[in-house]
Amino acid sequence: MKPTKSNKPKKTTKFPKQTESNTDDFFIIDSVVYFTLLGRGKGTFAFVSLDKWPIVSKYKWYLGKSGYPVSYDLGKMQLHRFIYTLIIEGKIPSDIYVDHIDHNKLNNTNSNLRLATPQQNSFNKSTSSNKKGVRKISENNYKASVVKNGITHEIKNIPTEEQAAQIYNLMAEELFGEFAAPNKIDF
């Protein structure tokens, strides 16, 4: 039978199972509650401060596509924004970010969250290598550079990549303060 408009199957939206609960699998260590996420995050633990657990546990939390825990019960509310709303007891402006200090999207403890402007949040990006802000110019010649407010701050003629990474870290700390995301340097 050839599909026609009338007998063609309709697209359906898959919703997470409503029978699951995050409260089925959780544990507490040192005033931090670790709980399993549902859906694609099954087996992944998110964590919150113990004082927020009674409220957080009322909702189902899933691992969103972006890697953040989300609740569809709250209209795709991300857990870190939900927690911070509880901390400040009010609404967070849409143009303000809730930043994970340690860059771990699953760590939603009170002490790991802070408010940040979009610019401050961009300062705090993590790196996958020791080369953030470092560029090789030629053999044994590197430069360290940081951009803030459209102005490039740079130091050239640095003999090693490691030294350039250290100099970048110092410049970033001076310019961005607590929002600086330094290179990881092995000593």
From Swiss-Prot:
Keyword Translocase attributed: no
Pfam families: HNH_3
GO molecular function ontology, one term from the record: endonuclease activity
InterPro entries: His-Me_finger_sf, HNH_nuc
Enzyme superclass (EC): hydrolase
Keywords, ordered alphabetically: Endonuclease, Hydrolase, Nuclease
Enzyme Commission number(s): 3.1.-.-
Listed name of the protein: Uncharacterized HNH endonuclease L560
